[in-house]
């Protein structure tokens, strides 16, 4: 009997990024189904998907990946949604000498200064997003405020965006927790920073 191919999927089944997590899970299942012609087998070996909920929390994601490698004996893992969770998971892949395919977290540091040889990614990173957005309004006399989530995704994204700007000026950076539902105070700080600036004003939300 050929040995099963076990793939760990660590994603936000619950938590603030649940919507992205559901998309990731659906994409992985559809992709495997398509790639195997609906058989979920490769060379006679059955593909088994082991799903783990990181809850959008770095410590939970780290322990869930460790469990997938050690207890479930997965051959490789996919995930997570959150960049903060991804950064916590990177050393686990290295310690276990097993592949982690990061999807869809985009922080530059995942495949930048925090990268190790077991880490791959299928999507773009923050710098690529930033370069495209900066090209759209990087002009003299433009004032820009940023509004981002206060963790690796938001902070890496703002840094990449600032690095891509050559002419426009960043006049304010606002970071809010991922579970924020009342933006009144943060928005007011943005408006106060922008109100007396001449020329075109842009709020860039990450």
Language-model features: locations:
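Beta-alpha junction/loop-to-helix N-cap segments that form part of ligand/metal-binding clefts
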Residues: 19-26, 34, 38-112, 122, ...
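Short, low-complexity disordered leader/linker segments with a strong preference
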Residues: 1-6
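Cofactor-binding loop segments of dinucleotide-utilizing enzymes, especially the Rossmann-like FAD-
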Residues: 12, 54, 149
């Amino acid at each position: 009997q050929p040995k099963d191919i076990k793939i760990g999927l660590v994603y936000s089944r619950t938590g603030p990024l649940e919507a992205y997590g559901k998309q990731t899970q659906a994409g992985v299942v559809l992709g495997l189904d398509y790639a195997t012609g609906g058989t979920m087998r490769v060379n006679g070996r059955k593909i088994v998907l082991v799903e783990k909920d990181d809850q959008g929390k770095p410590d939970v994601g780290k322990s869930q990946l460790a469990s997938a490698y050690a207890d479930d004996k997965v051959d490789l893992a996919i995930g997570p949604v959150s960049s903060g969770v991804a950064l916590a998971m990177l050393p686990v892949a290295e310690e276990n000498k097993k592949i982690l395919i990061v999807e869809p977290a985009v922080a530059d540091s995942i495949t930048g200064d925090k990268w190790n040889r077991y880490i791959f990614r299928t999507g773009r990173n923050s710098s690529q997003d930033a370069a495209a957005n900066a090209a759209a309004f990087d002009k003299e006399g433009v004032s820009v405020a940023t509004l981002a989530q206060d963790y690796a995704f938001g902070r890496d994204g703002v840094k990449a965006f600032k690095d891509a700007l050559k002419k426009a000026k960043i006049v304010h950076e606002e970071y809010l927790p991922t579970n924020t539902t009342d933006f009144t105070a943060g928005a007011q700080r943005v408006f106060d920073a922008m109100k007396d600036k001449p020329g075109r004003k842009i709020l860039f939300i990450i």
